[in-house]
């Protein structure tokens, strides 16, 4: 079997209601999808994440001009070989960022082909499923005004509860006083209802303010405090980690085994959050997972993107061992973004859907998606 072609699809659509996280306003949804075709007729799908405000054309250009020429004619099942070929070819200019996202999308598609060629889901190739269903947590609580939205966000918490979620992650980073008002309102709305809360500031604060916010919320029993400071500042992570009795999480903006080696060696986080669609794909993810396990750090993937990224991440999360074995161990949970995203339910025949706060792990070959090509045409970005 040989790789015959690699195509990218840049999707874009304006949002009816723009929303904000701490780093800016999201006014449209983007996606960079990757299709690898073979001379045998098998096709694999992957996704290169459009993180934050990243346009899809960046990763698409990297795939077309840097990766595709060195992969045509190769056996797509040579997963480690091709990952290293791509990495070494782009190392001098692409160890992180959009270039690594491009590599990730291709790698995911190759694993999809490998699974399909054997008739097994990718989690089987990764060593099997530790779990056949995964608890989902609602990521949301984005802003539509900026500040002063505690009442609306409290109502959102109630909606998530009614929709079956028993774990929720609240987006903060809009000023500490506003953050605390939001958290109090959310807690009041969920009073008497068993719910696990998490917070994510998307690196909005420096060390002093990150610690100040955490100390004010130490009595909440947070499952995690995500990205308290900037990803380039591991010393800051260490300072926050040492100052608080809250599990610290981070890593969505870190890449490959090499990046996580430095991140984990400083004992800066309790929970590592690589994103499959930018950390280097399945090939890098399994190495990052082994490294984290050796450091006693739980891996809980960051998940953002289309139905393809979600499906691939579900395969990975099924295969992740717990960091601390126990009869009632803390299991990885699935980040279920509840904001508007048309490239999910519409894009594939059987999207990732939660029911009563849980997601079943599919056993379809590869990553388990069948793409609706009409959606690729409907949302094609104009170049």
Regions found by a protein language model. Name each.
Residues 1-40, 45-52, 340-347:
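Structured beta-strand/loop patches that form or line metal/cofactor-binding pockets in enzymes
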Residues 37-117:
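Metal- or metallocofactor-binding catalytic centers and their adjacent structured scaffolds
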Residues 127-244:
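Metal-dependent enolase-superfamily TIM-barrel catalytic cores that perform enediolate-based chemistry
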Residues 65, 215, 221, 232-358:
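Shared catalytic-loop signature of beta/alpha-barrel
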Residues 103, 171-175, 202-203, 226-230, ...:
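Glycine- and other small-residue-rich loops at beta-strand/loop junctions that grip anionic moieties
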Residues 1-5, 9, 116, 120-132, ...:
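N-terminal amphipathic alpha-helix/helix-capping segment at the start of soluble metabolic enzymes
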Residues 365-383:
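Extended hydrophobic packing segments that form well-structured cores
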Residues 3, 34, 41, 67, ...:
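Conserved, mostly hydrophobic/aromatic
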């Amino acid at each position: 079997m040989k790789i015959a072609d690699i195509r990218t699809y840049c999707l874009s659509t304006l949002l009816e209601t723009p929303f904000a996280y701490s780093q800016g306003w999201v006014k449209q949804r983007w996606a960079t999808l990757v299709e690898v075709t073979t001379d045998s007729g098998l096709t694999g799908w992957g996704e290169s994440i459009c993180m934050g405000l990243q346009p899809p054309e960046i990763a698409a250009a990297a795939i077309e001009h840097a990766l595709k020429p060195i992969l045509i004619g190769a056996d797509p099942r040579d997963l480690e070989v091709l990952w290293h070929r791509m990495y070494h070819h782009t190392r001098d200019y692409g160890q992180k960022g959009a270039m690594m996202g491009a590599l990730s999308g291709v790698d995911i598609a190759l694993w999809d082909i490998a699974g399909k060629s054997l008739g097994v889901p990718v989690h089987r190739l990764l060593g099997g499923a530790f779990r056949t269903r995964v608890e989902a947590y609602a990521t949301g609580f984005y802003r539509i005004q900026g500040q002063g939205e505690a009442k609306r966000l409290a109502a959102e918490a109630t909606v998530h509860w009614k929709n079956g979620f028993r774990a929720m992650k609240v987006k903060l980073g809009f000023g500490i006083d506003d953050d605390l008002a939001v958290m109090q309102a959310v807690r009041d709305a969920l009073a008497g209802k068993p719910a696990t809360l998490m917070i994510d500031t998307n690196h909005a604060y420096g060390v002093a303010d990150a610690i100040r916010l955490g100390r004010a919320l130490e009595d909440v029993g947070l499952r995690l405090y995500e990205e308290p400071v900037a990803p380039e500042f591991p010393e800051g992570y260490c300072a926050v980690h040492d100052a608080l009795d809250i599990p610290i999480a981070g890593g969505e903006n870190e890449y490959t085994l090499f990046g996580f080696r430095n991140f984990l060696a400083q004992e800066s986080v309790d929970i590592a959050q690589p994103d499959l669609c930018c950390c280097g794909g399945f090939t890098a993810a399994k190495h990052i997972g082994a490294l984290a396990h050796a450091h006693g750090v739980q891996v809980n993937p960051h998940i953002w993107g289309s139905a393809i990224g979600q499906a691939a991440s579900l395969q990975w999360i099924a295969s992740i061992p717990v960091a601390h074995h126990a009869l009632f161990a803390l299991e990885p949970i699935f980040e279920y973004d509840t904001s508007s995203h048309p490239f999910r339910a519409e894009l594939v025949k059987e999207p990732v859907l939660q029911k009563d706060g849980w997601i079943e792990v599919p056993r379809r070959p590869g990553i388990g998606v069948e793409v609706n090509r009409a959606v690729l045409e409907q949302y094609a970005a104009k170049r």
